[in-house]
C-alpha cells in the first residue's frame, strides 16, 4: 500500500487537500532555493531535501520489517536540479489543470510510487500524528501508548526548519505507530 498524492488532490476532504497544497508550496519554496543556489550545498540538502521513510506507517517496500531506504541524496540532487531546469515553470505551467507534485517522478528512473509515497507521508505526517493521537486517546488503554517526541513532525514556515512535537501515540517495540486512513491509500501505480 502507498499514500497516493492524487487521492489527496482529488479528495473532498479539506484536510487532505491541505496536505497536497502544503507539498506544492514546499516544492515552490525549494524551486526558489534552487534558483538562488544553482549548486546544492550539503547543509541545504540535509535540511530541506532529505526525506526519510516514515517507517511508523508500515507502508511501502521492504525486505524485512518497516525500515525502507527512503529518499536518498540522489533524489535530493535530482530534485534540486530538476526544479532549476526541466521544472523551472513548476506551479505556473498551463498544460495540466492544477499543480501536481507527482511530476517529480520524471527526475529519475528510480522515483516511483514508493518514493512518492514516502515524500507524501512526510507532509501528511502532522495529520497522521494528530489522527492517530485522537484514536489512541479514544480507543486504546494507557499501557498501549506513550508520549513520543516526533522529529520532523511539520515544516515551520517562520523558521524554515522541520520542527519536532510531542504526541501521545500507540507504542510497538519502543517506537510509535501511525494509522493511515484508507482514503489516502492505493495499491495501484497512479503516478
Where is each model-derived feature located?
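Nuclease-adjacent, charged terminal/linker segments that flank catalytic cores
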Residues: 1-191
Amino acid at each position: 500500500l502507498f499514500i497516493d498524492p492524487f487521492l489527496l488532490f482529488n479528495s473532498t476532504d479539506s484536510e487532505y487537500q491541505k496536505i497536497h497544497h502544503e507539498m506544492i508550496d514546499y516544492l515552490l519554496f525549494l524551486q526558489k532555493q534552487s534558483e538562488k543556489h544553482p549548486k546544492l550545498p550539503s547543509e541545504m540538502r540535509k535540511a530541506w531535501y532529505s526525506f526519510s521513510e516514515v517507517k511508523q506507517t508500515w507502508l511501502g517496500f521492504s525486505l524485512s520489517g518497516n525500515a525502507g531506504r527512503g529518499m536518498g541524496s540522489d533524489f535530493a540532487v535530482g530534485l534540486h536540479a530538476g526544479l532549476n531546469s526541466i521544472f523551472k515553470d513548476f506551479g505556473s505551467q498551463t498544460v495540466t489543470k492544477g499543480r501536481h507534485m507527482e511530476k517529480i517522478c520524471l527526475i529519475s528512473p528510480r522515483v516511483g510510487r514508493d518514493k512518492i509515497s514516502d515524500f507524501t507521508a512526510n507532509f501528511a505526517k502532522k495529520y497522521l500524528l494528530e489522527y492517530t493521537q485522537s484514536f489512541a486517546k479514544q480507543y486504546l488503554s494507557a499501557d498501549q501508548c506513550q508520549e513520543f517526541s516526533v522529529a520532523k513532525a511539520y515544516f515551520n514556515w517562520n523558521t524554515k526548519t522541520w520542527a519536532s512535537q510531542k504526541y501521545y501515540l500507540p507504542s510497538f517495540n519502543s517506537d510509535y505507530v501511525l494509522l493511515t486512513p484508507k482514503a489516502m491509500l492505493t495499491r495501484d501505480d497512479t503516478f
